[in-house]
């Protein structure tokens, strides 16, 4: 069955998804802007693979968010802080049965939607200020997703895959609904590994656990994952941050299936990799700090769990971001 899909944010991950979904027979529309929009409208989207070969999707559609019409599935592939400003326009991409797939890093804005317990339907101000996403997109539309691949937009309309093809999907309720099953089947047919999780929040925390630690520490120190893990003081800092976050997560029912030491060892094994947050500092871009760290601090406040180390790292990283944005240029030690 062919799906009618809009991809909001035709960057690295959005382009990767869109090319493969289009080539497997789905109707894909990229919501883009600027030179990227012009390139896709003129030439389609190209995906350069790890082995040096390329895939080209010439027949995809592309338009601005204000020109787009409703679709059956709407993929949100931009960064977390970029969603709220266009939440109202995203809402206009939806008909009564549209599913919205959230692919952002960090704690999602819909985290407490229908989550059984004392915090059910609590809204998170750190990642959805003013409740724009809750109001205009609606948590009932959401399918959660965890993104594992790495890719790069190397030119307008051209994406390079670095590695990976796994996207885990899950309903906030944990049910294997018709809509999530149909989407998973379409993604598998397109060549992705797409398990459907019955506990998407715990799946999100597995990735978040590393991101909330290594991203801000790398931004502050300009160190790679390998450097952070090999230096005793920053390795200990990472362990302390992860322990504070684990306490918050477990209070909310999250199950951590590996130890802190194993999670750090996994990051160390990645090697001399610059995190996305460090790359954003180097290029003078806004950070995903609220989604990755501010949201976890907010969860701690809600649960009455202190997070002193997370608070300190957040404060320093927030000031660094403000300084970089105020000066209008990136900061690099290379």
Segments from the language model and where they lie:
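NAD(P)-dependent Rossmann-like dehydrogenase/reductase catalytic/cofactor-binding core
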Residues: 2-3, 227, 235-334
